[in-house]
Swiss-Prot record:
Keywords: Isomerase, tRNA processing. It holds the Pfam family TruB_N. It is an enzyme of class 5 (isomerase). Its EC number is 5.4.99.25. NCBIfam families: TruB (TIGR00431). This is tRNA pseudouridine synthase B. Belongs to the pseudouridine synthase TruB family. Type 1 subfamily. Responsible for synthesis of pseudouridine from uracil-55 in the psi GC loop of transfer RNAs. GO terms for molecular function: RNA binding; tRNA pseudouridine(55) synthase activity. It comes from the Bacteria. It catalyses: uridine(55) in tRNA = pseudouridine(55) in tRNA. The lineage of its organism: Bacteria, Pseudomonadati, Campylobacterota, Epsilonproteobacteria, Campylobacterales. It comes from Campylobacter concisus (strain 13826). The active site is at D38 (nucleophile). GO terms for biological process: mRNA pseudouridine synthesis; tRNA pseudouridine synthesis.
Length: 273
């Protein structure tokens, strides 16, 4: 079965564990997800079955929208609610100061990814090294905060809604926010609300063509050439400029790349659900 939909991952389990539940629920063997959610996080998880997993890299998943609650005065090496090491009774802040800091953190921000993350360090996930107590450093990266809004402040908990670029770490955003406040902080909760046009709709199967970030092209030649995986000629295409294109037919889809007047199959004959 080929399908794509948004699932609502609950807090308290890994994305892989949750995917296993979905595979058993729908009786499928091949499945995957795009964009890992940490175990403590909940919300939007894009899931695909069958050959649709091959389209993950072509999905339009930006911006990502999160609702995050920052715990002022709490310390955790993993910057979440699973490894709290200390809780300090810190002074309540006025909303004007919090709004000023929120406003400062709009745009592109340099940050260091959390050590408890899925980043690779010499082929090993960073969180595995962190859990084993190994010393290592991660390189600074850039994330972009498009929009932010304070939803609630009930001291010591500050809840914000953030619209961010793909690859952003909300735990790192919280750490920077805490540095500007002058408090140790951690996240007490994190919910991913949406990714681009993807949002939770009771696991409704979606038309994948509406979510692809690639332009459609038209092939005027014999469709059997595509079905048989034969060499295609550039003059048989409506658009002949270099790029990656979707060929969309009633029962299947293909993705091709035009490069130097040569046509290469990136994906071919993916059946529609």
């Amino acid at each position: 079965m080929n399908a794509i939909f948004v699932a609502n991952k609950p807090a308290g389990m890994s994305s892989n564990h949750f995917l296993g539940r979905l595979k058993r629920k729908y009786g499928v063997k091949k499945a995957g997800f795009s964009g890992t959610l940490d175990p403590f996080a909940s919300g939007c998880l894009i899931v695909a079955f069958g050959s649709y997993t091959k389209f993950f890299r072509f999905l339009d998943k930006s911006p990502k929208v999160y609702e995050a609650t920052i715990w002022l005065g709490a310390s955790s090496p993993s910057m979440d609610n699973e490894n709290i090491t200390e809780i300090s009774n810190v002074k309540e802040l006025n909303l004007e100061k919090l709004e000023a800091i929120r406003g400062e953190l709009i745009g592109k921000i340099s940050y260091i990814p959390p050590k408890f993350s899925a980043k690779h360090v010499n082929g090993t996930r960073a969180y595995k090294l962190a859990r084993s107590g190994e010393e290592f450093e991660l390189k600074p990266e850039i994330m972009e905060i498009y929009e932010s809004e304070i939803l609630n402040y009930s001291h010591p908990f500050l809840t914000l809604r953030l619209s961010v670029s793909e690859g952003s770490y909300i735990r790192s955003y919280a750490e920077i926010f805490g540095q500007k406040v002058g408090y140790n902080v951690t996240l007490s909760s994190l919910k991913r609300v949406s990714e681009g046009k993807f949002r939770y709709e009771n696991e409704k199967f979606l038309n994948i063509c509406n979510f692809l970030n690639i332009e459609q092209n038209t092939y005027f030649g014999d469709i059997n050439n595509i079905l048989d995986g034969k060499e295609l000629k550039i003059n048989d295409f409506e658009t002949q400029t270099q790029g990656i294109y979707l060929l969309n037919y009633d029962k299947f889809m293909s993705v091709i790349q035009i490069m130097d007047d040569t046509i290469n199959y990136t994906l071919n004959k993916v059946e529609k659900c």
